From Swiss-Prot:
GO terms, biological process: regulation of DNA-templated transcription
HTH tetR-type domain mapped to chain residues: 28-88
SUPFAM superfamilies assigned: Homeodomain-like (SSF46689)
Source organism of this protein record: Rhodococcus jostii (strain RHA1)
DNA-binding region(s) from the entry: 51-70
Protein name (database record): HTH-type transcriptional repressor KstR
Cited function: Controls the expression of genes used for utilizing diverse lipids as energy sources.
Amino acid sequence: MTTSSRSRSSTVAAATLGEDDLSSNAQKERRKRILDATLALASKGGYEAVQMRAVAERADVAVGTLYRYFPSKVHLLVSALAREFERIDSRGKNPPGRNPLERMQLILSQITRAMQRDPLLTEAMTRAFMFADASAAAEVDQVGKLMDRLFARAMTDTEPTEDQLAVARVISDVWLSNLVAWLTRRSSATDVANRLELTVELLLGDGSRRPE
């Protein structure tokens, strides 16, 4: 998802019930079960396996209830992706490293390897994120902000500046495009690692390395 597509208008946005919209523990638990069911189905069969009726059955909720929480499978999968990034972000720790370059390389490597360990799930979440329309703009924006914040945290121990957030956004876009290239077998895992390393060195390094 490019920066421009991330910022599309949300004039036709459909309502997904997030954690903050749920008043009872039972509702929050139901939402968790729905997302857990979505991840389990996607992990076994990819994007096509995530059907609303199958999710409802696995989560033990009525189909009508599922639609009140998530209007479509795209909303489901993008929300599941957001939850995965929230889990990483909630740890609240900067990755080890002597400087921003080392920390950024480490966090990119960790996230990329985690995604590559479950290619069907990654394909499903990434496909939904890439092709979400304006109705899922709020969910897409949430994922984008989580990625930007996660990568910006590698650059500073304090609140990131606008410049740092801009760099993080570039890295987010490069990371996502390379993840898609790996999923579609246009790039190997080694190719992805090399490109990400070069990107980080060009943006955060001392300028000594140039692309060959």
